[in-house]
Amino acid sequence: MGKSLSHLPLHSSKEDAYDGVTSENMRNGLVNSEVHNEDGRNGDVSQFPYVEFTGRDSVTCPTCQGTGRIPRGQENQLVALIPYSDQRLRPRRTKLYVMASVFVCLLLSGLAVFFLFPRSIDVKYIGVKSAYVSYDVQKRTIYLNITNTLNITNNNYYSVEVENITAQVQFSKTVIGKARLNNITIIGPLDMKQIDYTVPTVIAEEMSYMYDFCTLISIKVHNIVLMMQVTVTTTYFGHSEQISQERYQYVDCGRNTTYQLGQSEYLNVLQPQQ
C-alpha cells in the first residue's frame, strides 16, 4: 500500500532550498493523491472482491463457458451479465422450429377435422320380416303384429347411439298402429347394424269390412297395402339427428307369414326423406 520516498539532498542556497521545498510539497501531494486513489480502489475491491474458487466447493460458471467458477449453493443468488451479441441469446434453427410447430399444429387440426367431421347416417328399410295375424270374431277385428327390419349404417369415425325408433302403420290414410323403441343400441365407427322392430296394428270399427276380405276362404293370398313410416333418432357429441322413411308394403292379413328379406314384397312408392 505505502510507497517509500527517497531523501531529498540539501540545497546550498535559499532559492534552491525554496525550490526543493516546493518540489517536495508537490511530490508529497502527488504521493498522497496516489495513495488516496489506491485506497479508494482497494475499498472498491473490498466491496466487490474478485475471488477465484477452486476445489470441491465450486461449480463451473454457466455464463463464462467454464473459465470461471462460483461457490456451490450460490447459483440462485448470483447474476451473470451476458453480452447482447452472445450466440446463446440467438438460438439456432428458430425458424425451423417455428415452421415445424406450425406444421404439426396444422396436421393435428386437419386430422381432427377429418375424423370428427360429421358424416351421414344411412337408414335403409329392408322390409317386413314377419306378420302374425289373429281375429276377434265377435268384434270383427283383425290384429296384425308386423315385424320390420332396418339397416342402419354409421359412416362416421366415431360411435353413434340409436336413441329411439318411432314407427307407425297406415291403412287407407288411417293410422292403425304405432310403436316406439328407446335406447336401442350403439353403432361403432364405420359399422352397420340390423334392427328389428314390431308394430302392433288393429283393423276394426269403420274398417270392419276388411274382416270379411281377410277371412275369405276362396282367396289364398289376402294382401293389403300398408304404408310403413319410421323415424330413427341418433345422437353423437350431444347432437341429435333424425332420419325418416316411408314405404308401401304388401302384408297378408289372412295368415301368419314370414317373408324372405331381399325378395321384393313391397312397393317403393315414396322415396326416403333426405
UniProtKB/Swiss-Prot annotation:
It is a single-pass type II membrane protein. Glycans are attached at residues 145, 151, 164, 183, 256. Its main location: membrane. Residues 2-96 are cytoplasmic. It is found in: Late endosome membrane; Lysosome membrane; Cell membrane. GO terms for biological process: dendrite morphogenesis; lysosomal lumen acidification; lysosomal protein catabolic process; lysosomal transport; lysosome localization; lysosome organization; neuron cellular homeostasis; positive regulation of dendrite development. It holds the Pfam family TMEM106_N. The chain crosses the membrane at residues 97-117. GO terms for cellular component: endosome; late endosome membrane; lysosomal membrane; lysosome; plasma membrane. Residues 1-20 are annotated as: Disordered. Expressed in the brain, including in the frontal cortex (at protein level). Expressed in lung epithelial cells. The modification Phosphoserine is found at residue 33. Changing residue 210 to A: Decreased number of infected cells by SARS-CoV-2. No effect on infection with HCoV-229E. Residues 118-274 are lumenal. Residues 1-11 have a biased composition (Low complexity). Coiled coil: none annotated. Disulfide bonds join 214-253. GO terms for molecular function: ATPase binding. A lipid is attached at residue 2 (N-myristoyl glycine). Keywords: Amyotrophic lateral sclerosis, Cell membrane, Disease variant, Disulfide bond, Endosome, Glycoprotein, Leukodystrophy, Lipoprotein, Lysosome, Membrane, Myristate, Neurodegeneration, Phosphoprotein, Signal-anchor, Transmembrane, Transmembrane helix, Transport. Can form homomers. Interacts (via N-terminus) with MAP6 (via C-terminus). Interacts (via C-terminus) with the vacuolar-type ATPase subunit ATP6AP1. Interacts (via N-terminus) with AP2M1 and CLTC. Interacts with TMEM106C. It is linked to Frontotemporal dementia 2: A form of dementia characterized by pathologic finding of frontotemporal lobar degeneration, presenile dementia with behavioral changes, deterioration of cognitive capacities and loss of memory. Gestural apraxia, parkinsonism, visual loss, and visual hallucinations are present in 25 to 40% of patients. Frontotemporal dementia and/or amyotrophic lateral sclerosis 1: An autosomal dominant neurodegenerative disorder characterized by adult onset of frontotemporal dementia and/or amyotrophic lateral sclerosis in an affected individual. There is high intrafamilial variation. Frontotemporal dementia is characterized by frontal and temporal lobe atrophy associated with neuronal loss, gliosis, and dementia. Patients exhibit progressive changes in social, behavioral, and/or language function. Belongs to the TMEM106 family. In neurons, involved in the transport of late endosomes/lysosomes. May be involved in dendrite morphogenesis and maintenance by regulating lysosomal trafficking. May act as a molecular brake for retrograde transport of late endosomes/lysosomes, possibly via its interaction with MAP6. In motoneurons, may mediate the axonal transport of lysosomes and axonal sorting at the initial segment. (Microbial infection) Plays a role in human coronavirus SARS-CoV-2 infection, but not in common cold coronaviruses HCoV-229E and HCoV-OC43 infections. Involved in ACE2-independent SARS-CoV-2 cell entry. Required for post-endocytic stage of virus entry, facilitates spike-mediated membrane fusion. Virus attachment and endocytosis can also be mediated by other cell surface receptors. This is Transmembrane protein 106B. It comes from Homo sapiens. The gene is TMEM106B.
